[in-house]
């Protein structure tokens, strides 16, 4: 029997008394909401494409225990283990992304998926958490060791990773990674002038992407189009918000999900709006916001730059992806093909988000790993 007393030296007891329970609870609530919404959204999509009604639900429930277990396992680790996990994960992800360029499965004009042991994997999903931690490690190294070119290495890795993402092409993921990297760079001490210059370069890259990639042009033009010329999925998504009103039509009573091809992935927020109303949508927004704010507040109390930068990168990535998904669902920005973390269907997204949140829970634990803080390398 596990002893959970404060005096116990067991790994689990030690974890229990040091992990931030509020952060863990918020993340768990998002996962639970995701399970219910998948039960609502997935069967209609499965029936439409001719597979069993519970096809997507079964697959999601297969990945969910693995993802939650991965998150809890990583949350028990110290700073050294988190850094090593991120570095190894980043290198593996880069290798898989290169393989995807040659042997990937093309979907909607992009080669982002690779089949491994019968499962389709999207390697770029794992770039967000791993690169955020690697960048934090490099930025801290620049400040801690005078001869260590951390900033230069970070810039080189960022440029290389960005090229791989654009070759797929995955403009949405490129935007998220760029925003998080620039945010971390600013927190590490980069002057506001240079941040502005890099931001303007980013805008220039977006304009270039518009002219280089036809699918980017199509999505932007659909976003700017009049109400009558909106894309089919966006029209139906807005209809779902109108149908749901404040309290929703009731669990399983939604009709728009019968017509939206991506109701279980990119547009699952619309299903939530139609069946449970704006109250649940506001609750989901609040949960994501609370995760980001809570992680930021905890990390700011620490004097370790790596913890501050890594927590900022991981939590901001989590929140930004949620904002992009929800905003595109409500036609507040062009669609990006980005999932709602822990809620949308998708094994790659689920595992990658669990990886990121596991590392976030680990680095925001109480001072149990204080002896690890001064040994960055």
Regions found by a protein language model. Give the residues of each.
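A juxtamembrane structural motif centered on a specific transmembrane helix
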Residues: 1-5, 11-12, 326-377
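N-terminal membrane topogenic signal
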Residues: 11-27
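Residue-level "hotspot" positions that anchor or transmit function at local structural transition points
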Residues: 17, 259-260, 342, 351
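Hydrophobic alpha-helical transmembrane segments of multi-pass inner membrane proteins, especially
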Residues: 26-32, 36-40, 47-233, 270-328, ...
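Short, small-residue-rich loop/turn micro-motifs
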Residues: 42, 241, 245, 330
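Glycine/serine-rich anion-binding loops at beta->alpha junctions
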Residues: 117-127, 167-169, 245, 249, ...
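Transmembrane helix boundary and interhelical junction motifs in multipass membrane proteins
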Residues: 170-175, 249-253, 263-265, 282, ...
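TM-adjacent membrane-interface loops and short helices in multi-pass inner/ER membrane proteins
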Residues: 222-269, 278-280
